[in-house]
Amino acid sequence: MKAESGQTSRRILCVFPRYTKSFGTFQHSYPLMDDVAAFMPPQGLLVIAAYLPDEWSVRFVDENIRAATADDFAWADAVFVSGMHIQRQQMNDICRRAHDFDLPVALGGPSVSACPDYYPNFDYLHVGELGDATDQLIAKLTHDVTRPKRQVVFTTEDRLDMTLFPIPAYELAECSKYLLGSIQYSSGCPYQCEFCDIPGLYGRNPRLKTPEQIITELDRMIECGIRGSVYFVDDNFIGNRKAALDLLPHLVEWQKRTGFQLQLACEATLNIAKRPEILELMREAYFCTIFVGIETPDPTALKAMHKDHNMMVPILEGVRTISSYGIEVVSGIILGLDTDTPETGEFLMQFIEQSQIPLLTINLLQALPKTPLWDRLQREGRLVHDDNRESNVDFLLPHDQVVAMWKDCMARAYQPEALLKRYDYQIAHAYATRLHPSTPQRASKANIKRGMIMLRNIIWQIGIRGDYKLAFWKFALRRLIRGDIENLLLVMVVAHHLIIYAREASRGHANASNYSIRLREAAVPAE
């Protein structure tokens, strides 16, 4: 579906802001690969670009790949921006540059939807999802593209049905430069974890696209150059279990038709381990990774954060069950909880050893607006606004002790030998049970060339020039002896980033939360 403009032509520059370097964007991996420069295409901005009227010209710039230029701004009638809290500084900077050309700037996305007061300099704020606010913004720009005298806020009251969503405008993006693709099947999550802003922003009743839409989008992504993997960005892939069961057979057939070109990944709650019928279909659809918000192995803490659904199955048992279907578990972990003790760090390290999960996003607790956690801490007077701190939460343990615990866990969890040992375990117990499709599409000349470039870069940058070459060669030789080059490449692309980033974090050179941004980083010159 597209909006209408009454035949008026406009030129819209869509700019996606650069990410602050973080654990989850894998910047340290890009030099190992062929022409990769960014993590994944921004769904929201590309959907908006596709929704704009046919009469409008649209240009898309992802500043993780290249910066918007003076020529881009000179071409445009208006600028659209979208992003998350951690991109706040960069969003404000784009606004300032656009205003240098006297262009009106509209901001949408999750950050402004949660905190419109963060963005006083933007001309238009789009609060909420695609819907009537989008149509109002389009109508306003159809009528007039001069900057308004004061900020105008459009708030979505009537969301567009997801079955009417257009295919994201992948053709505008340099898809081959992304580490992986992204796709959205549903929006919303039925659970109310205390720290999570998803239910407040997108609702508790998951809204859905049709399986046919998803298949069409996957076909378009391949046409536009997405390769390797596609990540379902749904807040919870099994938020509607019936819908997941409806979609999965379509994905299985699509994979067979297209030669299993893409591995799939998603986010889901741990109770997926109780649904073997879903896990078996996911295996057949070539799902290879699930991000599970385990948060903590402490049952008392899980109950306190209203994450009781993580206790429907013993955590270690759930992880092993998921892995038995060939699916690697990636885990979210939070430190700084009210239930933490001085021994929590050691408890976490024991859990990592027992679970053998290689990749864990270990964050300090951060209170996000529009969450029950924010409301509770505000009542308790425990929200802290201090740009010298790693979190806006007044922990019950001393702040410096919690930060030191986080640094220690990062350093130990991603020590090269320990990390690669966990990957050895995954290869033997999870990767061994997944599908191993052999198709002409996977063995294409382009894929073989890409693999050879990656192998060359990995051997040169890690095996010869790197400072953990002994651990690397112990791991690599085991893979090479078995002819297992694919897993060698897949593991080292991820592991290298984790090792380098963890070193930066343990030295205090990285934020202790992927969801925070310090005030000094968010500051921009006043206009």
Curated annotation (Swiss-Prot):
GO CC field: cytosol
Q: Which PROSITE patterns match?
A: RADICAL_SAM
- Which EC number(s) are documented for this chain? 2.1.1.-
Query: Which one GO biological process term can you cite for this protein?
Result: methylation
Concerning InterPro entries, the annotation shows: Cobalamin-bd (IPR006158), DUF4070 (IPR025274), Elp3/MiaA/NifB-like_rSAM (IPR006638), HpnP-like (IPR034530), rSAM (IPR007197), rSAM_horseshoe (IPR023404), Tetrapyrrole_Bchl_Biosynth_MTs (IPR051198)
Question: Which one of the record's GO molecular function terms can you name?
Answer: metal ion binding
**How many cofactor units bind, and how?**
Binds 1 [4Fe-4S] cluster. The cluster is coordinated with 3 cysteines and an exchangeable S-adenosyl-L-methionine.
Report the induction information.
Answer: Up-regulated in an EcfG-dependent manner under a variety of stresses, including high-temperature, acidic, alkaline and hyperosmotic conditions.
Coiled-coil stretches noted in the UniProt entry, renumbered to this chain: none
Q: Which residue range or ranges hold the B12-binding domain?
A: 36-148
Positions annotated to bind [4Fe-4S] cluster: C189, C193, C196
- UniProt entry keywords in alphabetical sequence: Iron, Iron-sulfur, Metal-binding, Methyltransferase, S-adenosyl-L-methionine, Transferase
Superkingdom of this entry's organism?
Bacteria
Q: Where is the Radical SAM core domain?
A: 173-408
Which metal ions or organic cofactors does this protein require, according to UniProt? [4Fe-4S] cluster
Q: Which family does it belong to?
A: Belongs to the radical SAM superfamily.
What protein name is recorded for this chain?
A: Hopanoid C-2 methylase
Provide the species name.
Rhodopseudomonas palustris (strain TIE-1)
